[in-house]
């Protein structure tokens, strides 16, 4: 296995860097910074923290991801995928617990990158990914109903069903003006692309509805529309760094949540980088990208930030506006920093109903309802994984959905592999020319009397280890020699070795000799390391079936010297 090489895309991108490229990166960075502002505020508030912490996350994480990342155009920051898990951690462990969980997740991501496991993340079953994202979308939508309608409920339950019960019980307290602001924001965001695709609809909606709310408050005496300033104190500065108390009990309690953050971050960042590759024609480095994501999630929470990852929408905005290198991402972070320092206090006038409208659109875009509907016509096993992951995400939390979804997917995968592994009994004759890589030009070989030949087609792992024994029991024969043809066995695991060892010992007690045929180098090495050959003797390991049959005849002759 090759060792990992630390090669951020920024370094290679600066070779031959021109004034024209910088101009393109500058314009793209400014635009992406402006686009990221309302999303950072919305994601911060929806996650249960103050709006400036969402902006701080976009600044610090965006800078680190662009500085160290494995993609030239990836833009990092807070995303909707983390809202549910972050809100749950804060509710249970407080913001200190969130800091610890995020740092742990960052460490996990760094290790995934260092050990070159970036490509493995891409093997997570698609139904699980869709179940996650669709479930998160439903949860985000559900959490925004109170602000969207301006309900005056004192406290809203954390769980899905009680939350909706609370909404229905308090529907009579809805504020008409908040509803107008919320629905108006949704309408602007949905329709604005028909007017202009350069300026994001979310920014237009926030500007328009903030101005409307300000005018209504100042000149009409309206106080029913809640704004950010009514709920949060806005700071126009970066907080100092702080290292949390990471006791062992806290680490143990938060480890499952940290794994969930790491998995979600890895999936979304690599998906975003892959989508970007398809547009730019470039190729990202998955492992380098994971290290950058990990570093960002280690550093950002020390300054009060929340989990961050690569963001598809902001990355595509960067590409569409001419971003060429990671410099655009660095500029985007600088623009957000200037906005925080110079215009931070003005964000207090943004109405909560408007941010709820922004997040409703985010939830809709995340829902992947067309993909969800298409997957419902897939094999039942995939549908089961999809629905279980989706329902657990909505009704419980992402950590449970992550654990159960992956376990179910693994079990179903093992069942499928076990079903594809076939064990057959060869009778009377064998075609020696069927062995891969040889052509003997010989006629079919005759299986001697007293010899059984079994052929295994597929991996010999714990999922099918017992199937071989069941096949022999079903035959009910007691031969003198059993030849196990393993030319189509790509690998064997510990359980397979254990069962094969038990078979050899049982056969030896019954006076039956085991001979292996066609063992490939990988399986040969595994069996040798397990000292399996000491049990049956190296002479009973044959490279091809013709040699195995010859060894069987020698064994029969030795057992019956007077018989020809």
Where are the model-predicted features located?
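Short secondary-structure capping/turn micro-motifs that flank functional sites
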Residues: 334, 523-524, 543
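Active-site-adjacent beta-strand anchor residues
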Residues: 76, 131, 516-517, 542
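The feature marks cytosolic C-terminal regulatory regions of anion transporters and related permeases
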Residues: 236, 365-535, 553-564
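Transmembrane helical cores of multi-pass ion-transport proteins
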Residues: 1-432, 511, 531
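Generic hydrophobic alpha-helical segments
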Residues: 86, 164-167, 468-472, 548, ...
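Short acidic-hydrophobic, aromatic-tinged amphipathic segments that line or gate anion-handling sites
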Residues: 535-551
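Short, contiguous clusters of charged residues that form electrostatic/catalytic patches at enzyme active sites
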Residues: 28, 186, 190, 466, ...
């Amino acid at each position: 296995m090759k060792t990992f090489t630390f090669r951020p895309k920024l370094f290679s991108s600066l070779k031959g860097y021109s004034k024209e490229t910088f101009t393109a990166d500058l314009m793209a960075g400014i635009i992406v910074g402006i686009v990221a502002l309302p999303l950072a505020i919305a994601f911060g508030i929806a996650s249960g923290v103050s709006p400036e912490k969402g902006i701080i996350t976009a600044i610090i994480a965006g800078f680190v991801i662009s500085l160290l990342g494995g993609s030239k155009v990836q833009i990092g920051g807070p995303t909707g995928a983390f809202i549910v898990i972050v809100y749950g951690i804060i509710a249970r462990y407080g913001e200190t617990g969130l800091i610890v969980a995020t740092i742990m997740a960052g460490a996990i991501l760094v290790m995934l990158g260092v050990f070159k496991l970036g490509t493995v993340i891409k093997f997570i079953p698609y139904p699980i990914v869709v179940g996650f994202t669709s479930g998160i979308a439903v949860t985000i939508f559900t959490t925004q109903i109170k602000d969207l309608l301006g309900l005056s409920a004192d406290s809203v339950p954390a769980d899905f069903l009680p939350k909706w019960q609370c909404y229905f019980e308090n529907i009579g307290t809805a504020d008409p003006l908040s509803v107008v602001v919320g629905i108006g924001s949704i309408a602007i965001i949905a329709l604005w692309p028909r007017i202009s695709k350069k300026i994001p609809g979310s920014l237009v909606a926030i500007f328009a509805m903030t101005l409307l709310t300000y005018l209504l408050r100042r000149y009409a005496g309206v106080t029913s529309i809640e704004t950010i300033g009514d709920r949060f104190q806005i700071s126009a500065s970066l907080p100092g760094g702080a290292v949390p108390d990471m006791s062992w009990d806290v680490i143990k309690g938060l480890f499952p949540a940290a794994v969930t953050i790491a998995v979600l971050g890895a999936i979304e960042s690599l998906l975003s980088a892959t989508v970007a590759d398809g547009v730019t024609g470039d190729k990202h480095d998955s492992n380098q990208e994971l290290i950058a994501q990990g570093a960002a999630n280690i550093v950002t929470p020390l300054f009060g930030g929340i989990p961050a990852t690569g963001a598809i929408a902001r990355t595509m905005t960067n590409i569409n506006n001419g971003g060429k290198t990671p410099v655009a991402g660095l500029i985007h972070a600088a623009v957000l920093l200037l906005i925080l320092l110079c215009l931070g206090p003005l964000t207090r006038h943004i109405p909560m109903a408007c941010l709820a409208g922004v997040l409703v659109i985010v939830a809709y875009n995340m829902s992947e309802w067309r993909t969800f509907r298409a997957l419902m016509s897939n094999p039942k096993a995939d549908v089961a994984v999809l629905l279980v992951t989706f329902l657990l995400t909505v009704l419980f939390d992402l950590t449970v959905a992550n654990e159960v979804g992956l376990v179910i997917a693994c079990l179903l995968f093992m069942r499928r592999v076990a079903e594809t592994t076939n064990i057959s009994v060869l009778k009377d004759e064998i075609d020696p020319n069927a062995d891969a890589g040889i052509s003997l030009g010989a006629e079919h070989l005759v299986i001697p009397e007293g010899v059984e030949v079994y052929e295994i087609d597929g991996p010999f792992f714990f999922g099918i280890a017992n199937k071989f024994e069941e096949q022999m029991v079903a035959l009910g024969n007691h031969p003198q020699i059993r030849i196990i043809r393993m030319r189509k066995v790509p690998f064997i695991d510990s359980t397979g070795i254990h069962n094969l060892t038990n078979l050899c010992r049982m056969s030896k007690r019954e006076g039956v000799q085991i001979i292996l045929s066609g063992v490939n180098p990988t399986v040969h090495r595994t069996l040798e390391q397990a000292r399996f050959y000491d049990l049956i003797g190296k002479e009973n390991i044959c490279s091809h079936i013709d040699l195995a049959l010859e060894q069987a005849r020698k064994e029969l002759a030795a057992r019956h010297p007077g018989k020809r």
